[in-house]
Amino acid sequence: MFGIVSGLLSHPIAFFESSEALRQKRGLVTADGMGETFQTNVFGHYLLIARLTEAMAGGRVIWTGSAASQLQFKACDYQHVWGDKPYESSKYIVDQIAVPLDQRLRPFGVRCLVAEPGNVCTNFLAGLGLPLFEYLVVGVFYFIRFVLGIARFTINADSGAEGCCYAALADEECVDSRIKYHSQVTRTGKAYVGQFPLVQNKDTAAFLMGRLDGLVKRFDEPK
């Protein structure tokens, strides 16, 4: 609680733009022996792409990006099983592999892009069984967006989909795998697409592609 209050008082805009307030569990591993968040957000999709590449001609792979931090990524624990921020680490991996994966898929007529939906209010509070509280929280988010002008506070799903729709439907000459397409809104809720360069390290990208390809081979081996 102290961390939340401190974040709100010291850096309110950056606080709301991150997942700083979320508590994430360490040591979560799937039945396949992988970090749970890593397999959910990265490898499951990567494996699907690897197996369907030849059937995807003319299509696009749109990764959903989010808060990504190099500070949370460690090569020795690239699946971030034992770190504090597995979610941020998984999104950092997405940013790193987007360009080399796009280069690999292009000969098949497939593009690989990253879009970010911003902060969308989903049913994450539904488990509390307090619908009025949910409405209150959403109302507070609208108020904060209007007062502070936080462009990534898309709040509703339609506005949050703006970046993904652009990445999926824009003409070929209008998209670039080195760009992340952000869903953004004005204070009053008018949606638009912000374009920002991906922060990428080529050595890290090559390392991650090698690890992911190795995991794909492991899954393709006869049991």
Kindly give the residue locations of the regions a language model identified.
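Rossmann-fold NAD(P)H-dependent dehydrogenase/reductase core
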Residues: 1-125
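NAD(P)H-dependent oxidoreductase Rossmann-fold/reductase module
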Residues: 66-223
